[in-house]
Regions:
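Transmembrane helix-bundle signature of multi-pass secondary active exporters and lipid flippases
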Residues: 25-78, 142-149, 238-304, 324-332, ...
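Alpha-helical transmembrane segments of multipass membrane proteins
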Residues: 37-40, 112, 154-158, 177-185, ...
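Short alpha-helical transmembrane segments in multi-pass integral membrane proteins
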Residues: 1-22, 80-145, 189-245, 301-368, ...
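Hydrophobic transmembrane alpha-helices of multi-pass small-molecule transporters
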Residues: 64-67, 179-183, 208-213, 285-288, ...
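Helix-loop interface residues and adjacent transmembrane-helix termini in multi-pass membrane transporters
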Residues: 34-37, 46-49, 83-86, 161-162, ...
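Membrane-helix interface/capping residues of multi-pass secondary transporters
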Residues: 40, 49-52, 89, 118, ...
């Protein structure tokens, strides 16, 4: 038990533990994003515009499966954090084994479905026929390694639920560098195109999963369940599915909205598709720390809810919002100032239109980043207290507002590419209008403080 007691967030200072928990979480997810970013940069530079469009247009489909998995793990981790905060280790061990078995089964089924249905799904979102062969090859290879994605997310979320965000980072950093090396080898040296990029991603994720499992077996006694890994507790499954499915539905709702937006973008030509792929990668890097600050708040609040420390929950929430604000201001300065340099990473020298479109978008979106910072902080609060339905409904409101805005601006009014940033802002405002009254009500009802 001594291996993880130091990660107990129910006592001591608030700011320093919250920041020290958040930083490895942010770094870990940024390194994870380098998987797809490396695909985009290397494929765009060494294979071409159409290959970059193929990778980008398949990414939202891939993300639906990945975010279903991470959503289930995230929902289960809220329960784990509360059980750990309450020192209920027997229930915690059964929670861990039940989540693992259910997640593995889901991953296998989803992988088989996508191996069979890759082409029809791509046509459903209006991917041009010329891009389908490369996009389908990329998808099939990625889905063959979906079990690795689940196992790493499961093991990492379990450690984070106990307050340990540093250990998953160490494995992920190694895996990220291997992925970049693999991209260079398979794409640049062997010239395997988008298929080589997908192979590099799967291999790196498999290694990350393996290293994480070995470490847990040797270093974290609480998670060495032995035969208990095969315990499937039906009584816990219901609550796990409730929390996990709500969180997963939230993630899928977000990606379905992105798919609809992608289907609109796909009608605007290959250059616009490539620019959209590039700015989405930048947005992913920008949003990830905001999301991770919210996840750190979730772990902090859930552990303290299990321990019954309501005043500490309130202070943790306020501290988390302050961190979100400081980060968003710094983000604006970086994206605004470096937009041209950022876009040249994703396009060949001759793709001036792609670079120009991306710069106009980034200059506009950069000053709006404070809004997702606020929404992620509020969502961290509701996840931490166990009210995941609010996070689901608010995400739906966000994507509904964004999709409507995209259709009006792009399809009806024929506005320029940068108007996608205004659509994002509209979605965030709708989301906050839904969340803030519920937050005030929850505070008044004594959920914390």
């Amino acid at each position: 038990m001594s291996t993880i007691e130091k990660h107990d967030m129910t006592q001591g200072k608030i700011l320093l533990p919250l920041v020290s928990f958040t930083i490895p979480l942010v770094l870990g997810n940024l390194f994870q994003l380098t998987y797809n970013a490396a695909d985009s940069v290397i494929v765009g530079k060494y294979v071409g515009e159409q290959a970059l469009a193929a990778v980008g247009t398949s990414t939202p489909i891939m993300n639906i499966a990945i975010l279903l998995i991470s959503g289930m793990c995230m929902g289960a981790s809220v329960l784990m954090s509360s059980q750990y905060g309450a020192k209920d280790y027997d229930t915690l061990s059964r929670q861990i084994s039940t989540t693992m078995l259910a997640g593995c089964g889901f991953s296998v089924v989803f992988s088989l479905l996508m191996l069979l249905l890759a082409n029809p799904v791509l046509r459903l979102i209006r991917v041009p026929e010329t891009a389908i062969p490369e996009a389908a090859a990329y998808l099939r290879i990625i889905f063959m390694g979906l079990i690795f994605t689940f196992m790493y997310n499961f093991l990492a979320n379990t450690m984070r639920a106990l307050g340990d965000s540093k250990t998953p980072l160490y494995f992920l950093v190694t895996s990220a560098f291997l992925n970049i090396f693999g991209d260079l080898f398979f794409v640049v040296v062997l010239r395997w195109g988008v298929a080589g990029s997908a192979i590099a991603t799967v291999c790196s994720e498999g290694l990350c999963c393996l290293l994480c499992g070995i470490y847990i077996k040797k270093k974290i006694p609480l998670l060495c369940l032995g035969k208990k890994w095969w315990v499937f507790d039906k009584s816990l499954l219901g609550k796990t599915v409730s929390y996990g499915s709500t969180s997963a539905m939230q993630q899928v709702c977000l990606q379905l909205g992105k798919l609809i937006i992608q289907s609109v973008v796909n009608t605007q030509g290959v250059a616009v598709m490539a620019a959209f792929t590039a700015v989405n990668r930048v947005d992913d890097f920008a949003y990830t720390p905001q999301q991770n600050i919210g996840h750190a708040m979730t772990t902090f609040l859930a552990q303290n809810k299990g321990a019954g420390h309501k005043e500490r929950m309130k202070k943790g929430f306020q501290t988390g919002l302050l961190i979100e604000l400081v980060y968003s201001i710094g983000l604006f300065c970086v994206i605004w100032g470096l937009a041209p340099q950022i876009m040249t990473l994703f396009a060949e020298d001759g793709d001036a239109q792609v670079v120009s479109l991306g710069i106009s978008y980034l200059h506009l979106i950069s000053w709006m980043y404070i809004l997702p910072g606020l929404t992620n902080g509020v969502q961290g609060f509701f996840r931490g207290i166990g009210d995941l339905k609010v996070t689901l409904y608010s995400t739906f409101m966000n994507m509904f507002g964004r999709v409507v805005a995209v259709f009006v601006m792009i399809r009806l009014l024929q506005m320029e590419f940068a108007s996608l940033a205004w659509a994002n802002m509209f979605g965030w405002i709708v989301m906050l209008l839904f969340e803030v009254p519920l937050l005030v009500k929850s505070m008044r009802n004594g959920e914390c403080g």
